[in-house]
């Protein structure tokens, strides 16, 4: 009984203490919005949480559960018309898109009546994956936008749109339609050197631009940049990047500055690296499905995790369904919810319908604090758009006035 009273008082303090600041917005801008605040609290923050071998096992288990991801190295050379048609239709079934007859007809499903031979290609720039074969609309919440792929990503090409402008592809963690002009087609042996490059840099900052000819191409955190070798000359790496000539892949050398924005290996998986990596996105614009060359909530946490070599699914619902479970919120009181969230480790992912957040820790008052790519929140029934990566607590509300703490469905963390 005494413990229950303490929890109840803690919850009351939690909500009363945030009421005045909530009216001014959900973003925390004091010392808690700095990585140093959290790193200084972790005496063992740089100790390794998972070894490389353990991360391999974690990735393998997640891959088994995620029906959007694929083991491309062992991908079949052919795919049946039935299976491919089901996959193409799954994209629109999952999100119930409203679209014109012409756009749906452009999927060219009437011509899909026999097994298809898989072709191999590599992305030459950051490219959008679309749920239907149509270009972006310019809408900040374009419902046909799936995600975005980095340059130099190996993909399996499965089908083409009726107008010949889009290819239906399977990437490591997503499938959908991409602009065919962003794909360099090649043979499987060359393709494998991009799927598993022998020498590469890992992008450890939120965004890294590399000049290829007269164009800057964008790599996001966790992306691999293939290298010609591991030699540094004049503080520059020499990248090996794909371009398109006569419709096929050719390679070009590009210079990459040897700075703290890249590493020759994935970062160690530590508590402090969850903090450091997440704060590199602080203030970035919210980019639905990777639009605006940025991240939404699930891409944000995916990139933080992959910078340490952990491959989690792209979408929040898949992340919650495929990652190891820390907690599920079924029939628990508010006090119990607060206790569970307080015990979740730094780097844990907190889920509520349509959103995912990364836990930073508990502040000096014991309040759990999160960092996330937030689109909007509600205040007194009014929807307020923030559209940025920010630090907050879990008191902000949804459309029905329910605080985030009360709407959490689960917490996930590798193990």
Per-range role (PLM):
Residues 274, 288-318:
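Active-site nucleophilic cysteine motif
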Residues 30, 36-37, 373-377, 381-415:
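Low-complexity, Gly/Ser/Thr/Pro-rich intrinsically disordered linker/tail segments
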Residues 24-130, 140, 156, 170-208, ...:
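Boundary regions of SH3-family modules and the immediately adjacent low-complexity/disordered segments
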Residues 148, 313-380:
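...with weaker cross-activation on analogous glycine-rich loops/strands in unrelated enzymes
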Residues 142-175:
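A conserved hydrophobic secondary-structure block that centers on an alpha-helix together
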Residues 8-15:
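Bacterial N-terminal signal peptides
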Residues 142, 260-265, 283-292, 346:
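Second-shell loop/turn segments in exported
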Residues 152-153, 220-228, 346-347:
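Loop/turn positions that initiate beta-strands
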